[in-house]
From Swiss-Prot:
A Pfam family the protein falls into: NTP_transf_3
Entries under Gene3D superfamilies matching the protein: Spore Coat Polysaccharide Biosynthesis Protein SpsA, Chain A
Regions crossing the membrane: none
Cofactors demanded by this protein: Mg(2+)
A Gene Ontology cellular-component term: cytoplasm
InterPro entries: MobA-like_NTP_Trfase, Molybde_CF_guanTrfase, Nucleotide-diphossugar_trans
Catalytic reaction equation(s): Mo-molybdopterin + GTP + H(+) = Mo-molybdopterin guanine dinucleotide + diphosphate
Binding site for GTP: 8-10, 20, 69, 94
Name of this chain's protein: Probable molybdenum cofactor guanylyltransferase
Keywords, ordered alphabetically: Cytoplasm, GTP-binding, Magnesium, Metal-binding, Molybdenum cofactor biosynthesis, Nucleotide-binding, Transferase
Length: 192
């Protein structure tokens, strides 16, 4: 089954100094580099941008469906908003090095596992929750956590038993570049 790709675009870009998703690299905004990679995936049915109220208008100009994260409390509320559409593969808008084969692999594992979430995990336990697939039923869990003021997405994932974890160290080494995200202008040399 193909999934919706939800691109989180509501961050504040504090370390970058300006809206990094609009920063042009090779004549194109950073977020479009991320979306281009997603559009090369075989198991993505459509791309949706999850924007904040302050950047909704500019995100709509890219021609993709946009939903607004009304809560704006971080990735947890962006994912919560995206899950209103159904099952999603979620990524950050600042991930221009996504590997389409890896994204398809995550979706296949998610479909085969029939679990609430399918999340890449490093051997030290660190999760990659913004490079993962989630079922709609995870939305209820996130909603409860948000109501309780618990905003850490990684904690929400760790607290549910029904998760498919993908061991990153067992995957092709070159797939690891898929996790790269731009935080500072110095990071741009990697993709230019």
């Amino acid at each position: 089954m193909k999934l919706i790709a939800a691109v989180l675009a509501g961050g504040k870009s504090r370390r970058f100094g300006e809206d990094k998703l609009l920063f042009e690299i090779n004549g194109k905004p950073l977020i479009l580099h991320t979306i281009d990679r997603l559009e090369k995936c075989n198991l993505i049915k459509r791309v949706v941008i999850v924007a904040s109220s302050h950047n909704e208008k500019v995100m709509r100009e890219f021609g993709y469906e946009v939903i607004v994260d009304e809560l704006e409390i971080g990735p947890i509320s962006g994912l919560y908003s995206a899950l209103s559409l159904g099952e999603v593969l979620v990524v950050g808008g600042d991930m221009p090095s996504l590997i389409p084969e890896f994204i398809d692999y995550i979706i296949k594992e998610f479909n085969n596992s029939r679990k609430i979430a399918c999340v890449p995990r490093w051997s030290n336990g660190y999760l990659e929750p913004l490079h993962a697939a989630y079922s709609r039923e995870f939305r209820e869990i996130l909603g409860e956590r948000i109501r309780k003021g618990k905003y850490k997405l990684g904690d929400a994932i760790r607290e549910i038993p029904n998760v498919c974890y993908i061991s990153i160290e067992k995957l092709p080494v070159e797939w690891r570049e898929s996790f790269f995200n731009v935080n500072r202008k110095e990071d741009l040399h990697i993709i230019t």
